[in-house]
Amino acid sequence: MPVDAWVREEIEIPEGVEVSVQGNTVKVKGPKGEVERELFWPGVKIFVEGGKVVIYKDFPRRKDVAIVRTFKAHINNMIKGVTEGFTYKLKVVYSHFPITVKVQGDEVIIENFLGEKAPRRAKILPGVTVKVKGQEIIVEGIDKEAVGQTAANIEQATRITKWDRRVFQDGIYIVEKAGKPITF
């Protein structure tokens, strides 16, 4: 059963940003680069009209309204990415064995984690830069999902299973997302 006759969400396009829609693909170009994403849901129309991105659906059901607002959030994140970018900060924590972290190509190499001989590896997604400064790792990029996934890959590479986490707290942890500290 439809909720309303239609749902329409509008996003203002800021100065210096270009948005183009071709079929189901939304492209956002800005000062930091270009992000492209495919957004498809049956009956949902996305178009640019008078300096605004419009997301529209006729006779929406509850799920359709949720999808329209999700698409709005995705496009807002794309616009924020090409204007400001996204930054995650991770901290290297160890008590006994000093962990060495270095970037090699599209991988982060973690050596001497808990005294292990074999290095652990974490994948860096395309379009993301990783910098290591002492005990801090900075992950930056314009695609929010790629930056978040790269930070998660690094954090998961040092995950400890079958040991008491209250005692063995060594690892690499996300401590800041988009300038906001993460509390544990």
UniProtKB/Swiss-Prot annotation:
Quaternary structure and interacting proteins, as annotated: Part of the 50S ribosomal subunit.
Protein's UniProt name: Large ribosomal subunit protein uL6
Similarity comment: family membership: Belongs to the universal ribosomal protein uL6 family.
Matches recorded under Gene3D superfamilies: Ribosomal protein L6, alpha-beta domain (3.90.930.12)
GO BP annotation list: cytoplasmic translation
Annotated keywords: Ribonucleoprotein, Ribosomal protein, RNA-binding, rRNA-binding
GO cellular component: a single term: cytosolic large ribosomal subunit
UniProt function note: This protein binds to the 23S rRNA, and is important in its secondary structure. It is located near the subunit interface in the base of the L7/L12 stalk, and near the tRNA binding site of the peptidyltransferase center.
The keyword RNA-binding is assigned to this record: yes
InterPro entries for the chain: Ribosomal_uL6-like (IPR000702), Ribosomal_uL6-like_a/b-dom_sf (IPR036789), Ribosomal_uL6_a/b-dom (IPR020040), Ribosomal_uL6_arc (IPR019907), Ribosomal_uL6_CS2 (IPR002359)
Listed PANTHER family: 60S RIBOSOMAL PROTEIN L9, 60S/50S RIBOSOMAL PROTEIN L6/L9
GO molecular function, one term: structural constituent of ribosome
